[in-house]
């Protein structure tokens, strides 16, 4: 059996790949803007120097205005006061959550993010539909029908990260659908595995496997 947590986690990994891809593009765009701004400032500085050389100032005359200096580059800010790179960086945890858990600032960030990147909105919407399927108290047969409808929606999109996640789910579909038989999860087994790993780390390795298993059964049995 594969529970809903791992399914949603796999889809969120696909969304995370998209976020990182768009972030890298935003970083490249920001660097190009900064370089173009610096180049423009250098050009204006050379023009001012050339003008001062051709029109030397009379020291007896009062300066009419303050001397112009090079301006510092200021990146373009979005409506919430963040740059594109900052918005994409701070969206990591937000995109892994359900929309009903967002606060006001996250809702505003999500609105701007989805306006700037419609593909991420489409991917997040597809993930929310899978969440809704697993939250529904339906039979295994009904879940299979809904899951196949979701496959068709993914087929219609052009998001390669979500399609890769869809293929992974499709390959384990029978195990995924077993979740709807009694809605049980692997939480207990994963908790026990975590405890055993922690216990093994405290021992700094295992010299006698039989004695280690005996101690595990005694402590966690």
Residue ranges and their predicted role:
Residues 1-36, 190:
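Conserved beta-strand -> loop -> alpha-helix junction used to position metal-binding or nucleic-acid-contacting
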Residues 28-221:
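Acidic/histidine-rich catalytic cores and adjacent linkers
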């Amino acid at each position: 059996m594969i529970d809903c947590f791992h399914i949603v986690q796999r889809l969120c990994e696909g969304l995370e790949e998209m976020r990182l891809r768009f972030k890298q593009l935003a970083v490249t765009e920001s660097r190009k803007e900064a370089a173009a701004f610096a180049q423009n400032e250098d050009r204006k500085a050379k023009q001012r120097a050339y003008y001062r050389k051709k029109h030397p100032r009379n020291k007896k005359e009062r300066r009419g205005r303050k001397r112009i200096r090079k301006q510092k580059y200021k990146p373009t800010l979005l409506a919430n006061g963040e740059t594109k790179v900052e918005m994409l960086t701070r969206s990591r945890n937000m995109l892994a959550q359900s929309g009903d858990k967002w606060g006001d600032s996250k809702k505003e960030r999500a609105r701007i993010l989805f306006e700037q990147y419609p593909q991420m909105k489409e991917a997040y919407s597809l993930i929310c539909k899978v969440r809704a399927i697993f939250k529904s108290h339906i039979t295994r047969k009904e879940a299979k029908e809904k899951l196949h409808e979701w496959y068709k929606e993914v087929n219609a999109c052009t998001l390669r990260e979500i399609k890769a996640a869809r293929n992974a789910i499709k390959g384990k579909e029978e195990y995924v659908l077993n979740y709807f038989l009694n809605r049980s999860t692997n939480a207990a087994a994963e908790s026990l595995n975590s405890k055993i790993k922690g216990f093994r780390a405290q021992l700094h390795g295992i010299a006698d496997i039989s004695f280690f298993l005996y101690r595990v059964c005694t402590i966690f049995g």
